[in-house]
Swiss-Prot record:
It is a multi-pass membrane protein. The gene is mntH. Belongs to the NRAMP family. H(+)-stimulated, divalent metal cation uptake system. Keywords: Cell membrane, Ion transport, Membrane, Symport, Transmembrane, Transmembrane helix, Transport. The chain crosses the membrane at residues 39-59, 66-86, 114-134, 146-166, 175-195, 217-237, 270-290, 310-330, 362-382, 388-408, 427-447. The keyword Ion transport applies. InterPro entries: NRAMP_fam. Pfam families: Nramp. It comes from Staphylococcus epidermidis (strain ATCC 12228 / FDA PCI 1200). One of its GO terms (biological process) is iron ion transmembrane transport. GO terms for cellular component: plasma membrane. It is found in: Cell membrane. GO terms for molecular function: cadmium ion transmembrane transporter activity; manganese ion transmembrane transporter activity; metal ion binding; symporter activity. This is Divalent metal cation transporter MntH.
């Protein structure tokens, strides 16, 4: 990629600090015990994990289970392992260079190409936001009976949520997000237990099947799962928020320790996200696969299935279906927090443009609400069409992903830039393989889709 102009003479200290209001604000002492160091770095991974279990993951995983049983568990496994590798690369990028991925991309691309990458990054954040709008609007409908259009409009005002929470410090944000994540996890562990999945079929789902490639329907959902699992905005987000910890920016030793514990944090939280996504697909498969409604598997279907589940009874079924809707709303609001931060990182990093957070959030959320409102009007509130829009947004994220991965790969494999923290050879091989395979699958899917129009 000839437009990359890596220059070892660039001075990182001339860069504006990423997310300056939280950068270098949380204590980390390299002389502490291993457990204290781990606790000091426990947090950024939680915010990243949110993106791996947002409403986009819910619908793609549930539909994958409803339509194709446990076949796509293998895709969730591979996506999660790939995500751990890629997020570890963003950790090293942020800590080793003092720049986030957006700053790095802008710094080492010529201006026209950097603008193109910025536009794609912004569209990816809007696509992520569409999933949050739809998930939150459906949750409001399920809990309070609020019409979808009204619910979608209400989500515009959650712009003020992060602004309020930020007043209490970044650690409080991490704690709130972590609490909501474990709430969602607990709900789905119980609900999957009630749904009585086939354990042997589940285990077989982690074995690759050729139908994933040969069946366009399965491939479409698989790309949606990949897009919902490995999300572009998370790469920008993670490379920035790991810099919130205090460590000597000039010490190789302290940077190495920071990278070590930030990576452990990331892998632990992404393992939790992996379990949640497997539970989501399992729930869809256990309730719908092999029945007359196997082509559904949307939020409303799952809500109704839980509410009318004979094994639960009327009272417990009502409680569990309500908890499902509450978890969906919590997931959407959780993603709002991380989406806001990622949007700020992308705009400031690519454009060196700093605007009030409330205005930035209002613009992004408004751009996400518009297509949802249009879809609701055109299809007269058809919930199935709205859920299809959510799946499409996740497929777009998969298509946009290489535009984040390529700069990340090129930057983290550069000796002058990364020094002793550059990618090992095996990481370069795997990351380039991921980029090539994902790009090839995207091209194939687009061609097949247009041929059937």
């Amino acid at each position: 990629m000839g437009v990359i102009l890596l220059n070892s003479n660039n001075n990182n200290h001339e860069q504006q600090r990423s997310l300056d209001e939280i950068n270098n604000t949380i204590n980390f002492n390299h002389n502490d015990s291993a457990s204290q160091k781990f606790l000091a770095f426990l947090g950024p991974g939680l915010l990243v994990a949110v993106g791996y279990m947002d409403p986009g993951n819910w619908i793609t995983s549930m539909q994958g289970g409803a339509q194709y049983g446990y076949t796509l568990l293998f895709i969730i496994l591979i996506s999660s392992l790939s995500a751990m590798l890629l997020q570890s690369m963003t950790v090293r990028l942020g800590i080793a260079t003092g720049m986030d991925l957006a700053q790095m991309t802008r710094h080492f691309l010529n201006k026209p190409v950097a603008i193109m990458f910025w536009i794609i990054a912004e569209l990816a954040i809007i696509a992520t936001d569409i999933a949050e709008v739809i998930g939150s609007a459906i949750a409001l409908d399920l809990i309070f009976g609020i019409p979808l259009i009204v619910g979608a409009l209400i989500t515009v005002f959650d712009v003020f949520l992060l602004l309020f929470i930020m007043k209490f410090g970044f650690r409080k944000i991490e704690a709130i997000v972590g609490t909501l994540i474990f709430t969602v996890l607990a709900i789905f562990v119980f609900e999957v237990y009630i749904s009585s999945p086939h354990i042997i079929d589940m285990l077989n789902g982690f074995v690759p099947h050729k139908e994933i490639i040969t069946n366009q329907g399965i491939l479409y959902i698989a790309l949606g799962i990949i897009g919902a699992t490995i999300m572009p905005h998370n790469l920008y987000l993670h490379s920035s928020i790991v810099q919130s910890r205090k460590y000597d920016r000039h010490s190789i030793h302290e940077k190495a320790q920071a990278i070590k514990y930030a990576t452990i944090d990331s892998n632990i939280q992404l393992s939790i996200a992996f379990v949640v996504n497997c539970l989501l697909l399992t729930l869809g498969a256990a309730l719908f696969f092999g029945t007359k409604t196997e082509d559904l598997g949307g939020f409303y279907d799952l809500y109704l299935a839980l509410k009318t589940e004979p094994a639960l009874g009327a009272t417990l079924g009502g409680i569990m279906s309500t908890l499902f809707a509450v978890a969906l709303l919590a997931s959407g609001q959780n993603s709002t927090i991380t989406g806001t931060l990622a949007g700020q990182i992308v705009m400031e990093g690519f454009l060196k443009l700093s605007i009030p957070n409330w205005l930035r959030r209002l613009i992004t959320r408004s751009l996400a609400v518009i297509p949802v409102i249009i879809c609701l009007i055109v299809f007269k509130g058809n919930t199935e069409k709205i859920e299809q829009l959510l799946v499409f947004s996740q497929v777009f994220l998969s298509i946009a992903l290489p535009f984040s991965l390529i700069p990340l790969q090129l930057a983290t494999s550069n000796q002058n830039l990364m020094g002793p923290f550059k990618n090992k050879t095996w990481i370069n091989i795997i990351s380039w393989l991921l980029i090539i395979v994902l790009s090839g699958l995207n091209v194939y899917l687009i061609i097949q889709t247009f041929q059937e129009l």
